[in-house]
Amino acid sequence: MARIEQVERDKLTARQQTLYDDIMRTRPRGKLSGPFSVWIHRPDIAEPANRLANCFRVSPKLDKRLIELIVLLVCRDATAQYAWSAHFNLAREAGLNGEIIEAIRARRRPEFGRDDERIVYDLVTELLASKKVSSATYGRAEAALGRDGIIEAVTCAGFYAMIGLVLNTFEIPPQPGGDVLT
């Protein structure tokens, strides 16, 4: 059970209702969930978080497959159950190979058939492990993704790390029937 009350739209202030509607425009689920069910209590946090989320959900520069790879790596690192359950199928729909997803779940290095996935994996796992990136890893990432791609990849990883902290602190459970980490 979550540590924070899940509020219904009709119980929100006018500002929160407007924000709720804006958030729901880009999400397929019928009710506010995940970190936004926490952030809705603080519209000053929810508004910029929603704008940043849309950079990755609605108009990413990187291929959505790579965005979802980043998200799953961060979710696994944080054992963020809700985010994993929300992104497991999104990753498959974006074209991420199921064997890669299962390797991430098992905390094993996947076998990659695509260089861009291997490079993103190396960038993000190194960043998560050491909180910085070596010159060699940065150079490979810059050659493959470009400057803007690295900015997006690292910002996405940081955003989902923040989401993992919020989800875990407020014990937001996985989506009903969603895939879970063990």
Task: Enumerate the predicted regions with their spans.
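Hydrophobic alpha-helical segments
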Residues: 1-182
